[in-house]
């Protein structure tokens, strides 16, 4: 990890920073994919024709790392089909036609908490995931702190929100600071054995002075909570970057995050986790920033998860024909093919770009300027990664790829942003990382087959 970490200045474009979230009118129907988290897809437990209520479990988790799915409106299950994912695969999707009542399920009541195990079980049942983009199940992240080989002395609450345009976390801090406070107290009470003496650092960029002031007021009597102000430079929200800038510790590829003595949790994840523990209502809605050059009236909206993106765009309006629609931030969000796609648990923003701003410049040959290395928070040479990927001998290719440090890539796209040749550098790194994962899985499978 280099000393001058996180040094890219990108236009903030936080047009909705002062806009209190507005709850949308109830959509006619919602579409709930089974892959709204990292890990195995959830498995539907309802059938077509079933009547469901808000907060009702409709899909159970499958496998070691998974997350349940709950009904986000009350109504009738009209279809259990499939849809294409942003990564090219398919997943099951449950379609619910709303009855307009938003009637809560009888199961929605605060869980009974007695110890760490019951606390983690409740977080698991809530369906909470990392809402900053990774979508890692929150219970699994917290559970890692129980590893006897780790000593977690710092909990980093990621409130950086460093991507341009997005202000959903900012608004969560302004509207529900008490949920954040409750979340910290739940961790202190039920994970005290594993987080004993831990300091809680709310890591927030300096471009949110109103939120900083409110948080300082909220926690002024809590000596174990620090408001850690960060420079408003990109990519402060990447976990490796935040670890270094908040603690001075360096993340090493291949090691779990708590092995560095820290847990990191998104500020909205923490707040909504607390809301579930207080009320019993699982993750069924979220704040979504809708913005971009083609959006007529940028807004922060509160919408049921599963609402079609087209429903949000009807509210904000468009001032030109969309050239590209991105879910997430402009740096590492995902472009979608259809505005009929639904928002999911991690959909913190919908950005609409007009045809002019959506056109990518034509790529040319690398000029070896070194800007990608200079601006990479972990100092990766993407040009070297590109060359190594073309080596014929697989063993040599794998060894040299590991030596490039590509596994430490944080997917921030800083390299692509600064490349004067407009090369798809992020995609080169992602392809290399995927290749190394496939290779490792194949080697593991071969080893297990040999041992049988």
Regions found by a protein language model. Name each.
Residues 42-51, 55:
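Short histidine-centered loop motifs in beta-beta connectors
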Residues 347-363, 373, 377-452:
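Ferredoxin-type iron-sulfur electron-transfer modules in oxidoreductases and energy-metabolism complexes
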Residues 1-45, 95:
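N-terminal, Lys/Arg-enriched amphipathic/low-complexity engagement segments
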